[in-house]
Amino acid sequence: MKKKVLIVILILLISPLYAQDGIRWMSMNEALEAQTEAPKKILMDVYTSWCGPCKLLDKNTFGNKDVIKYVNKNYYPVKFNAEGTESVTYQDFTYTNPNYQEGRKGRNSQHLLAHALKITGYPTIVFFKENGDLIQPVVGYKTPEQIEIFLKMIANDDYLKLTTGEAWQEYQNNFKGSFK
């Protein structure tokens, strides 16, 4: 028992040191499994291989030390290729990409999970509750400063109080970001 406690303490002490190494991406299946052990919201980066803004989001935003630290602490981060072949079991259904064409250059067919989530542009960041239910997709490239409000609003459940456009506007006006 003491050995397990010591291991957990060491992991907690050492893990912030690795935050600078990058976001600890996982698959959607891994994130959903992790939620059963330790519930946490999921942040899904939906991208395609040909998407220029997706590459910028990866480099500039998900490479930012403040974003890395916050995402690793508050979310299970998922990387999901919207035109890939990964099989994902979500809410009792297994999603695939049956029309994927091996060796095709550029665009390919959309994965059925991306279709089910109504993803229409890339990149899209999709947020899920601790139980796996969809919260909200956020479409388009976001800088660290632009994504901060979404990361914190959703992690802190503030989005539950924002039921009108006016409430969202007031929230934005009062939000004081700290990401650089």
Residue ranges of model-derived segments:
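Thiol-based oxidoreductase modules, predominantly thioredoxin-like and allied folds used
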Residues: 22-25, 64-105
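Sec-dependent N-terminal signal peptides
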Residues: 4-15
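Structural micro-motif
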Residues: 41, 96-103, 111-126
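Detector for the c-type heme attachment site
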Residues: 55-59, 128
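Short active-site neighborhood of thiol/selenol oxidoreductases, capturing the structured segment around
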Residues: 38-55, 77
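A short beta-strand-turn-helix
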Residues: 23-42, 71
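A short, hydrophobic beta-strand/beta-hairpin element that forms part of a small beta-sheet core
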Residues: 77, 113, 121-138
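Non-globular targeting/processing and membrane-anchoring segments
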Residues: 20-24, 36, 118, 129, ...
